[in-house]
């Protein structure tokens, strides 16, 4: 229903317009207060790059963060990552991730980024506190913030927006009548717009999510996902249909697709109940970090990597590395 409202297919979005105007006025006032200096943003002693969205829902932001961290690491840059930690609740904040940190404490995306990149990661509702925690513990040269485009209390040097190339901006309205956290005109002020799938427009960077080999949660064994039989697909991400479509494009045809809420807590019994006799469970890598502790032998995940094309990605990376002292 939400997807139909936000796309404009359902006329119910009109009933929500008063709330959208209120959302837009409040969010606009907050941004303006920082722009005019009525509120002061905290500036870190190292450059800060924000990777965020203009819309609610999954746009492929986390793969972009992982891509950016890995690209900078290959260039010899010491990178730290901060996040709000959605879906997690720590005993105390800021929380610096360790190999023992669980998704219940830090959220699924920070744990995934930490495991994939090995970069220092910290989570806190106040992102400045997370930045300070990393700087106190690690000699990093730059901070990447996972989400937080609208978190203006943290000053930033580079802003990158990730856009779903198929859904774009829906009906274009603010939440809750539409998907927008900020209006599309905000693109004029960011440093880069990365478009996940669909067709990139002038000035935008095209991106595709490239699937790798399926990985067994228990053994780490790898195989072509099309070789797995009787698949039940599970996706607890912002836009589950994208994952199911990826499986189809790989030649894997799930018998059943189970969409879950983004950042949803997964209980062992609930996940186990999805798979019947002789079936194979295939999930996203983000779900896998929540399920690995209680995984069964027939549970697999399909990792994806961001693939950016054209000359603009290299220019963006050159611009970012030029900020590092």
From Swiss-Prot:
**EC assignment:** 2.7.1.130
Sorted UniProt keywords = ATP-binding, Kinase, Lipid A biosynthesis, Lipid biosynthesis, Lipid metabolism, Nucleotide-binding, Transferase
* InterPro entries (UniProt xref): LpxK, P-loop_NTPase
* Catalytic activity entry: a lipid A disaccharide + ATP = a lipid IVA + ADP + H(+)
**Lineage, broadest ranks:** Bacteria, Pseudomonadati, Pseudomonadota, Gammaproteobacteria, Enterobacterales
What gene does this protein come from? lpxK
Q: Which organism is it from?
A: Salmonella arizonae (strain ATCC BAA-731 / CDC346-86 / RSK2980)
> What protein name applies here?
Tetraacyldisaccharide 4'-kinase
Gene Ontology MF annotations: ATP binding; tetraacyldisaccharide 4'-kinase activity
SUPFAM superfamilies (alphabetical): P-loop containing nucleoside triphosphate hydrolases (SSF52540)
Q: Where does ATP bind?
A: 55-62
* GO BP of this protein: lipid A biosynthetic process; lipopolysaccharide core region biosynthetic process
**What family, per the record?**
Belongs to the LpxK family.
